[in-house]
Each structure stands twice: as C-alpha cells, then as structure tokens.
Amino acid sequence: MTIPVPKPAHPAAPDTNTDGLPNPKVVVPVEADEEEDDDDEEGKEDADGAVPAASHFSTHALDGTKKKKKKKKKPKKKKTGEAGAGGQSEPPRVPVSKLFPNGNYPSGEESAYLGENSYRTTSSEKRELERLAAQEDPESAENYNSIRRAAEVHRQVRRYVQQTVKPGMSMTEIAEMVEDGTRALVEVDGLQRGIGFPTGVSLNHCAAHYTPNAGDTIVLSADDVLKVDFGVQIGGRIVDSAFTMTFNNKYDKLLEAVRAATNTGIREAGIDARLSDIGASIQETMESYEVEVDGKVHKVKSIRNLTGHNILPYHIHGGKSVPIVANSDESAIMEEGDHFAVETFGSTGRGYVMDDGECSHYAKNPDVNKPIRLARAKTLLNTINKHFDTLPFCKRYLDRLGESRYYAALDNLVNLGIVQAYPPLSDIQGCMTAQYEHTIILRPTCKEVVSRGDDY
C-alpha cells in the first residue's frame, strides 16, 4: 500500500537479485502418487514380445524365471482444495504453520551493508545482540519469525494469483481470491493475525488505492495492466508487497523499468542512507527506460507524488517516506531496526496522480479524538476499533462483518477527521502505470528483503 506525497500549501502542479544472493525457499506443492498398477499388469512383455533387457541381468533371470516389470506410478490428479504431499493446495488453503511445523520460516534475501556500515556483517557483537534480543522476547522487533511467516503467506498466495488470474475475471473475484487465501494461510485471528490492508487491484491509469466496492462490475481485459498490492500481518508486523500483471507483451518494458527501479531502491537502502539519495537513484533507473506502444514511444516517468514508507506495528505508514524522485531534503535517513516498504510506480503519462473515483480505502486516525454526536457513527467506530484499530480497511470488509446502512456514518467519521479516506489515485486517462514493492528490514547485521520470492 502506497502513501501519496502531502500536497504543498501552494502547489505548482495540479492537486495533488541485485546482490547475487539466493532467493528464499518457497514450498512447492508435491503431487501424491497413485498406487501401483494391478497384478494383471505385472510381468508384461515389451511390444515385440521380449522381456525387458534389464531383467536378463537380474537375480530372477539366473534361474530361468521372468522378472516382473516394475510398474510406473501415475500421478494422482489433485482435486480443488486438496493439498499435495507436504505442499500447498489449489486454491491455497493449507496454513503455512502446517507446512513449517517447527515454526522456523524462511528468511528473505539477506545483503551485507556497504561502506562505513560494512563492519556490521562480521561484527560478533552485533550478531550476539541480535540473537539475544530475539531469544528474550518472541514479540520483540528483533524477532523476525512473525514477519517471515507473514512473508511466506504472501509468497504462496501471490503464486496462485499469478497462475490463476486471467482476462474475463471480475475485480471482486480477484480481490477475494487474494483475501480468502490470505485468511486461510495466516489462520486469521482478530487483530493478532490477518490481512494487513485492503487488496489493491488498480487498473491501467489508476496507480493505487482501488479495491472494488459492493456492486462493482469491472472485468479484467487482455490489454489491461493490473497492479496487485496486498498485505499480511502477524502481531502487527506487516508485510507489504506488490507486483504488476499483463496479458500481452505490449508493456513489458514498463514493467521492467519499475521492477528495476524498485531493486535500485532496495540496493541503495541501508542504515544511515539518505532517503533523498535513494529517490534520486530510483528516478535515474526508472527514467532510463522507454516504452513503444502502437508505434509511439513513451518515456517512463516516476510518479513523483507517490512514495514508499516505513512500517510500524499496526501502522502501515509510519511517518517516513521513501521518495521515487530526487528531492532536496537531506535530513531524513533510514535507521537501524526500521521496516520499510520500498515501492516504485512508473507511468507512460505525466507522472503525477490525483484523487479519482469512488473511495474504498479507509483507516482510523489514531491522533484524533473528537466528540461524536451521530449514534450510528459511534457504533461504526466501535466496529472499526474492534476489528481493524489502526489497520486500513475497506467497505467490503465492513459488509463482511454484517454492517449495513453505514455510508452516512462513515462520511461523518471522515468529516470529523477520526477516519482518513484514501481514494483511488490516477494519472491521466489512457496512460498505463505499473508498481513493484518489497518489505525490507534494516537488521543490525544485514539488510533483509523479507518479501523476496522467486517471482520478483
């Protein structure tokens, strides 16, 4: 989930595996085997009537008897929702805790720090402090098992999505495919485990913050560019990762540009790194690409008023922004222990987004405490506090909880500033936008791209 750059008081514009390290292991479904064929197939001769040559050298052949031919095992066809032996089902419904019964989940891509922080990689003191902190408090920020579990859920859900989503599916089908898989694999448990924020399925010129509301009729087409942005949280530790899907090769260079820009941001990230320098490097990579569409060449532009962000427990936007263009602020830096969502957006349009269309994304503002006079707004806020607290939510999630006739109450909470609305963000009509995003942890000893997979 992205964060738009705050609008200036007087805006000039309209309103507003590069380190060579292995990817984490991912559990792959293993097909169960069929039982051996019936006895009447045993000892069957070859087509020309001869016994298979290998049997002439068997112990059975020495006494003149014919060796029974070893039967080929036929793969058992897996039924919908059935797990392979030791693997994930299709659709994914096997909790990752069942696939990793020892409770140790794969780490992400780990990279050594460079420059003056390179000592951290080999520092026995840093390693010991990291180890002790994780042992002393399983819920501490230094214990990475919860977020690695969330990352494994993300990888397994998105693998199925990438294999299954096809033109002709509705946006609601796609969003619910992601969410149903996430709930099952994470073993949803109130605020302790569940969805990190509404599933973004933004299309084409819409870059972010679109998820279908009830009654949405939009259907995916073969020429669409689909951004899938979803989160998984365990104990408030959120994995935020996104990818882009297309169904022809027309926009391959756009996706390549954005993927490369995100990896540049990850490469440049580190303890004491200036956020402005990271933004400049991202922009340089992004805008070195061009896309030819129907004979017209488009320069890929970074969407300058969208950024990445740090992540705090139960807060998807922690207060620090990772720009994707150069800026003059040299004071903001990354620090040891930070969790960041490094995300970039590229566009064939003007590289600037504005609010566009019906809102679906919302989040409670923890810093606002105002009296509420509307009784229905009070009961709605109670629901929000109980089920989401400061985690983002959408109207479909309220519908799922049985809330009804709440639109006026929700508007009241937004007008009071108690709830923040996050409407869809779009570039100009007719252009295409793409997104890639990973969650990284700046550990004391190394940088870990916790959401890295074998796909991106």
From Swiss-Prot:
Which InterPro entries does the annotation name?
Creatinase/aminopeptidase-like, Met_Aminopeptidase_Type2, Pept_M24, Pept_M24_MAP, Pept_M24A_MAP2, WH-like_DNA-bd_sf, WH_DNA-bd_sf
Cofactor: record remark: Binds 2 divalent metal cations per subunit. Has a high-affinity and a low affinity metal-binding site. The true nature of the physiological cofactor is under debate. The enzyme is active with cobalt, zinc, manganese or divalent iron ions. Most likely, methionine aminopeptidases function as mononuclear Fe(2+)-metalloproteases under physiological conditions, and the catalytically relevant metal-binding site has been assigned to the histidine-containing high-affinity site.
Primary subcellular site in the record, as a coarse category = cytoplasm
| Record's keyword annotation contains S-adenosyl-L-methionine | no
Species of origin: Puccinia graminis f. sp. tritici (strain CRL 75-36-700-3 / race SCCL)
Q: Which residues form the signal peptide?
A: none
| One Pfam assignment | Peptidase_M24
Protein name per UniProt = Methionine aminopeptidase 2
Per UniProt, where does substrate bind?
A: 209, 317
